């Protein structure tokens, strides 16, 4: 899916952010957005459902048990939650949400629906339609044991859409303050290490 960007080669937060800007530039009526985030996304992934999804794509008798072990590595006796640290978990997270993505694209249009990991952004030309999309997302997420945080919102882009490390105001955007602070800290650590060498 073109508008999902997490853990996919050549697709990161900056690319997705700029793609959303391009879509809005081509469609100036898209002045509102819906934004949501799942609560503990990886912690709520159901093992049985994840394994069923994997089996739809992989039947290899050697590879399949290995992938099932990756799903269960964090909670071998439980039925919920996958490790956040493994590269395979990022892949599983994308795969787990794939059917929801397709259904939402069908409803919202491929250019209006965007997802990065567990953050979802839907662009629209009116609030009522975005609230309808919100209800659909809640309904689709429920069977997957995914819970949307209460901080979700529908708002005008001009008020500042906080997305993917940027704040977009429609006519201009800027880097989020905490993104700049974190980058400055990392740079200071690198400089400090170089001085000690």
Task: Annotate the PLM regions.
Residues 2-5:
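A short alpha-helix capping/helix-loop junction motif
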Residues 11, 16-117, 122-136, 151, ...:
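Conserved polymerase palm-domain catalytic core
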Residues 58, 138-146:
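A common structural junction motif
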Residues 70-73, 78, 131-132, 138, ...:
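Right-hand nucleic-acid polymerase module
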């Amino acid at each position: 899916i073109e508008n999902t960007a997490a853990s996919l080669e050549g697709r990161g937060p900056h690319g997705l952010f700029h793609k959303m800007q391009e879509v809005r530039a081509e469609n100036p009526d898209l002045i509102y957005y819906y934004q949501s985030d799942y609560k503990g996304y990886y912690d709520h992934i159901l093992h049985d459902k994840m394994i069923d999804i994997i089996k739809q794509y992989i039947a290899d008798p050697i590879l399949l048990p290995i992938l099932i072990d990756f799903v269960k590595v964090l909670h071998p006796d439980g039925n919920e939650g996958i490790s956040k640290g493994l590269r395979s978990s990022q892949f599983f997270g994308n795969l787990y949400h794939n059917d929801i993505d397709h259904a939402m694209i069908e409803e919202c249009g491929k250019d209006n629906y965007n997802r990065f990991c567990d953050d979802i952004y839907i662009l629209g030309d009116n609030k009522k339609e975005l609230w309808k999309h919100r209800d659909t997302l809640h309904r689709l997420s429920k069977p997957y044991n995914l819970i949307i945080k209460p901080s979700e919102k529908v708002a005008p882009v001009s008020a500042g859409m906080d997305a993917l490390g940027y704040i977009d105001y429609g006519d201009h955007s800027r880097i989020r303050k905490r993104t700049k602070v974190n980058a400055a800290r990392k740079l200071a650590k690198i400089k400090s290490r170089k001085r000690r060498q």
